[in-house]
């Protein structure tokens, strides 16, 4: 039962104020006096409005005066009658037809017809017949819409439909333009422009493109066409230059164009006058013009160059600088263009070269080839320059002559002889052989000896005939290779020289003259005289009275009535006297080039001749002595020979300074004699005999040094080969040479005992070298047998070294060794081998060597080197192993151990294949075929193997790296999965998130808003390549790193613009999700609270 409190009204005079749920009990009333509204609280705790203002039912008529304002829908079941205007500011919706007796007008400017099917606007006549219709078919979605206009023609019992497409196309059965039709595009079968008036154009396409430039908007597209589906498409457009044609789906390939100035341009080729038919085009390729047939015309080559082509053959190359003929070039005259049978008109040149610019003043100054005049062809080369014929074959003029008028013929042989040749022939008055006139010199080809400055030589096929030359000294000479005939010869200062004879039949055949005297060589009967002229008649005078020199031509006797010279006298009593300074006087060093009072010069290639220079014959004794030279050896000899050929002997003075005498040589009056057997006899040896007779040197030497033994106080020098000193001893006796110094034994060489050993021994140092009885060699330094050699080996007795040297490591830096090589100071980049061996395989080669040595490089300690490789050349393989002072061993290729390898770990605990590192139970151990185990301090940590591994549903592989049970992989760097073909599979992932490693904590703000900018996707993701190398894809789901990077870039790693793929920290996204969930949780809690309160109000109101 309601209490008094519950039926009281809570009041409010504030417009729009509603009571709070907390101030009303369920069913309690409140009133807003300003709004005239009652409120209560339902059993749900919601505040609800009461009264008609909030709804209700009215049964009966309602008469209302005043304005009626309603917010919401109005539903009328019945007839709506209106006597005044109907003003509607919203939308009037009717479900039936609207029939108006008058007009339906819209002042807003729009009339909309809407339908899920075809929308219509119809036009009917009074008989309700369709005149026309505007309709738009249903094309739902993102499609091109169409509006059609259909017009009836009842007279022709037909209709026409005009279609307007949303893509701008207009289609009509027929279009008639009374004046013109303007449209960007027309699709039709034909355009008829009959009955047009004067000055009308069939097509008027005046585009208003702005700006006027070579861009897309400045192109007027005129026509596009093709002949069938799939065929080539052609486009005709108007651009700034003119009309242009293209092919392709768009303006892809330029074809050809007409320019506004009248030019025509083609992108490929032009064919003119080819055989009939549409398919015959130029086959000369791009940038060509075909004339008449498809492979004759012009073909562009490069910038400024083009070819003329005839039947596919390039014949001329035209360029800015020249025209090149690529085939035989023929210049001729023709009246019909096909043959050259008609000569040209008079004074007509087949080719004219304009050469008058140098003002050469020859004719019209032009060069004319094939100039026809008087029935003959002439060729004129004009100009002030030079006509050059630079051919190895030269210039051939056949037949004809070469006239040089007002100039000269210059022949420049350059570094060869300049030659003019006169060809021989076998007819007429021609010479038989070729004859040449050559001009040359040898001062350049042989500067050290050449003295022929200028030579002009006449030759035929046999040899040279004559030449005239100037020497480097200035003289001029003329030589004839044969006889020389002349009616008279006048010789200048150089005279006449010949290797043949000078022949003259005149009595006075030769005259030598000067202004005062002349000398005439005169043949008179049986004699030849040399006769001087009278004084003053040297050139033309006759012979004088003197006869100073005559030769009897029958006997050869020379008659010189009076012979006198400055230093020589030929006396009538038979002697020749050389007075004054004889020829050849001077030092020995100049004698080869000097003469002598009696001088003979021998020039003979024979090798077995004797040339005497002085000879004396003793007639009574019938013997002859001569002095001369044997030219085979150059030996000067003194020779004796009897008339009967006996007693022929020769004493020789040889070029090497030795002298050979044929028998004993006696000195003085015979007191000393050198015998043929080498013995010397002399009376100086008498003092060494008891009888006083002459003794020879052999006996004297034997007397001086006793054969039985003696002491020499002087030096003994043996200059002899072979066994110059022979020691002879009995069987088993010693045989040696010993040296005593100061009366004490010092050394000996020889056999010192009963065996056949040979020694070299020092008594003082007790060191020696001994060749044993079996041929071994022993070296005993300081009395100790340390080294022993035989044919197989070198043995070193190391006990001597250990007896005198320490074996501790600490002193090795300054100790020598049994084999010790001190190279001294060497270069800073050098290698010196200490021991080297070499061998080759029989019949195979592969000469190889192994050596151990020392290498030095700049500013560091030495390296020990073992070199193994070829000994044939520097290119075949060789391996160099380096041992460094810091313990580093460098191996160029591979270290191969039989089973175990230790790197500072001592003896491995494992007996099989292993590598220990640091200690003997840490390293890599072979775990079977294709498997390696990693072990640390005996604990098996991990393995890798080529064996097959399978994880059902995830992956399988034939090779893997794994840890053993309970072991872990710990990384102090990144763990990176490089390839996009594979993934990382784990049971759980624990990411370090301790607050102790974090600072500057800031909670997310507006997390939901940030999260709303990130989308989740399903997608196909790259998964490596398949067996054929194609990209594989697999379905996946997740986020896009770029989207996350846009709001939280700190969660993304990688270069978005480079090739590095972006990596996303999904844990950071979890933090964002958590913050967004927290925001949603708070909002949901607040909404739940408000809902509960509203439920209570509604519940109270409904009671």
Curated annotation (Swiss-Prot):
Gene3D superfamilies: 6.20.80.10. Proteolytic cleavage and release of the chaperone in the host cytosol stabilizes the folded protein. It is found in: Virion. Its main location: virion. Residues 988-991 are annotated as: Interaction with the receptor-recognizing protein gp38. InterPro entries: Gp34_trimer, S74_ICA. One of its GO terms (biological process) is virion attachment to host cell. Keywords: Host-virus interaction, Viral attachment to host cell, Viral tail fiber protein, Viral tail protein, Virion, Virus entry into host cell. The record marks 993-994 as: Cleavage. Disulfide bonds: none annotated. Coiled coil: none annotated. GO terms for cellular component: virus tail, fiber. It comes from the Viruses. It holds the Pfam family Gp34_trimer. Residues 993-1091 form the Peptidase S74 domain. Belongs to the S16-like long tail fiber protein Gp37 family. Homotrimer. Interacts with the receptor-recognizing protein Gp38. This is Long tail fiber protein Gp37. It comes from Escherichia phage AR1 (Bacteriophage AR1).
């Amino acid at each position: 039962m309601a209490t008094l409190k519950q039926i009281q009204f809570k009041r409010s005079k504030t417009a729009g104020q509603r009571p709070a749920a907390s101030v009303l009990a369920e069913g309690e009333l409140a009133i807003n006096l300003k709004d005239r509204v009652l409120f209560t609280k339902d059993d749900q705790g919601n505040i609800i409005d009461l009264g008609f203002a909030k709804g209700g039912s009215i049964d009966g008529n309602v008469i209302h005066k005043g304005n009626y304002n309603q917010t919401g829908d109005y539903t009328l079941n019945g007839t709506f009658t209106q006597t005044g205007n109907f003003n509607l500011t919203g939308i009037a919706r009717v479900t039936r037809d609207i029939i108006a007796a008058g007009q339906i007008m819209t002042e807003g400017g729009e009339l909309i017809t809407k339908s899920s099917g075809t929308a219509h606007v119809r036009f009917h006549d009074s008989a309700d017949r369709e005149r026309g219709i505007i309709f738009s078919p249903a094309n739902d979605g993102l499609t091109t819409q169409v509006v059609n206009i259909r017009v009836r023609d009842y007279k022709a019992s037909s209709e026409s439909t005009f279609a307007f497409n949303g893509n701008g196309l207009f289609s009509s059965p027929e279009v008639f333009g009374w004046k013109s039709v303007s449209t960007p595009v027309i699709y039709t079968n034909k355009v008829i422009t009959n009955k047009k008036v004067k000055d009308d154009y069939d097509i008027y396409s005046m585009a208003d493109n702005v700006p006027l430039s070579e861009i897309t908007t400045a192109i007027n597209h005129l026509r596009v066409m093709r002949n069938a589906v799939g065929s080539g498409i052609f486009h005709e457009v108007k651009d700034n230059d003119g009309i242009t044609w293209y092919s392709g789906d768009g303006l892809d390939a330029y074809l050809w164009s007409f320019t506004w100035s009248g030019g025509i341009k083609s992108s490929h080729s032009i064919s003119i006058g080819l055989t009939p038919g549409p398919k015959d085009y130029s086959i000369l390729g791009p940038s060509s013009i075909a004339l008449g047939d498809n492979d004759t015309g012009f073909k562009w080559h490069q910038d400024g160059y083009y070819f003329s082509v005839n039947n596919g053959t390039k014949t001329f190359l035209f360029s800015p600088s020249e025209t090149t003929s690529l085939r035989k070039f023929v210049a001729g005259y023709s009246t019909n263009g096909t043959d050259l049978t008609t000569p040209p008109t008079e004074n007509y040149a087949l080719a004219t070269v304009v050469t008058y610019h140098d003002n050469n003043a020859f004719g019209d100054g032009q060069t004319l080839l094939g100039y026809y005049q008087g029935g003959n062809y002439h060729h004129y080369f004009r100009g002030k320059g030079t006509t050059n014929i630079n051919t190895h074959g030269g210039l051939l003029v056949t037949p004809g002559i070469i006239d040089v008028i007002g100039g000269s013929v210059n022949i420049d042989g350059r570094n060869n002889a300049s030659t003019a040749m006169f060809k021989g022939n076998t007819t007429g008055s021609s010479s038989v052989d070729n004859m040449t006139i050559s001009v040359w010199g040898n001062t350049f080809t042989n500067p050290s000896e050449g003295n022929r400055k200028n030579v002009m030589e006449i030759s035929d096929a046999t040899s040279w005939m004559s030449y005239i030359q100037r020497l480097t000294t200035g003289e001029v000479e003329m030589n004839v290779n044969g006889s020389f005939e002349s009616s008279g010869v006048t010789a200048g200062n150089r005279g006449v020289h010949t290797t043949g004879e000078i022949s003259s039949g005149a009595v006075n055949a030769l005259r030598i003259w000067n202004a005062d005297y002349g000398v005439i060589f005169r043949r008179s009967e049986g004699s030849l005289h040399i006769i001087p002229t009278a004084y003053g008649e040297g050139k033309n005078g006759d012979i004088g009275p003197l006869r100073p020199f005559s030769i009897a031509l029958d006997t050869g006797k020379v008659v010189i009535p009076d012979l006198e010279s400055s230093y020589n006298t030929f006396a009538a009593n038979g002697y020749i006297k050389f007075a004054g300074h004889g020829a050849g006087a001077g030092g020995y060093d100049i004698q080869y080039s000097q003469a002598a009072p009696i001088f003979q010069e021998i020039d003979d290639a024979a090798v077995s001749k004797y040339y005497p220079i002085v000879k004396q014959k003793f007639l009574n004794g019938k013997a002859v002595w001569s002095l001369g030279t044997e030219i085979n050896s150059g030996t000067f000899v003194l020779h004796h020979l009897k008339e009967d050929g006996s007693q022929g002997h020769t004493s020789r003075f040889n070029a090497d300074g030795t002298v050979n005498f044929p028998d004993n040589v006696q000195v003085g009056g015979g007191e000393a004699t050198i015998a043929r057997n080498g013995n010397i006899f002399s009376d100086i040896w008498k003092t060494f005999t008891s009888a006083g007779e002459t003794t020879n040197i052999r006996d004297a030497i034997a007397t001086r040094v006793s054969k039985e033994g003696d002491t020499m106080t002087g030096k003994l020098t043996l200059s002899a080969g072979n066994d110059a000193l022979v020691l002879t001893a009995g069987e088993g006796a010693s045989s040696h040479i010993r040296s005593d110094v100061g009366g004490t034994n010092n050394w000996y060489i020889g056999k010192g005992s009963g065996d056949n050993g040979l020694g070299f021994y020092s008594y003082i140092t007790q060191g020696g070298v001994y060749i044993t009885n079996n041929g071994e060699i022993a070296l005993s330094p300081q009395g100790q047998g340390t080294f022993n050699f035989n044919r197989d080996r070198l043995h070193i007795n190391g006990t001597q070294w250990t007896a005198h040297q320490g074996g501790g490591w600490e002193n090795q830096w300054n100790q020598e060794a049994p084999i010790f090589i001190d190279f001294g100071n060497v270069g800073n980049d050098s290698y010196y081998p200490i021991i080297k061996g070499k061998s080759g395989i029989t019949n195979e080669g592969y000469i190889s060597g192994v050596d151990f040595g020392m290498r030095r490089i700049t500013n560091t300690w030495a390296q020990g080197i073992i070199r193994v490789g070829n000994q044939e050349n520097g290119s075949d393989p060789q391996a160099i192993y380096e041992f460094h002072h810091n313990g580093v061993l460098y191996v160029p290729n591979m270290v191969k151990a039989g089973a175990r390898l230790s790197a500072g770990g001592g003896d491995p605990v494992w007996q099989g294949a292993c590598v220990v590192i640091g200690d003997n139970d840490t390293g890599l151990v072979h775990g079977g075929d294709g498997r390696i185990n990693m072990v640390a301090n005996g604990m098996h940590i991990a393995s890798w193997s080529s064996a097959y591994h399978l994880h059902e549903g995830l992956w399988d592989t034939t090779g893997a790296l794994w840890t053993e049970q309970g072991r872990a992989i710990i990384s102090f760097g990144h763990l990176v999965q490089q390839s996009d073909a594979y993934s990382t599979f784990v049971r759980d992932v624990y990411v370090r998130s301790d607050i102790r490693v974090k600072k500057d904590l800031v909670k997310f703000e507006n997390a939901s808003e940030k999260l709303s900018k990130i989308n989740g996707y399903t997608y196909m993701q790259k998964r490596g390549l398949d067996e054929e190398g194609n990209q594989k894809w697999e379905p996946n789901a997740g986020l896009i790193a770029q989207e996350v990077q846009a709001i939280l870039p700190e969660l993304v790693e990688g270069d978005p613009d480079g090739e590095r793929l972006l990596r996303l920290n999904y844990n950071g996204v979890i933090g964002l999700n958590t913050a967004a969930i927290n925001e949603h949780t708070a909002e949901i809690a607040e909404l739940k609270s408000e809902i509960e309160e509203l439920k209570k109000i509604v519940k109270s109101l409904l009671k």
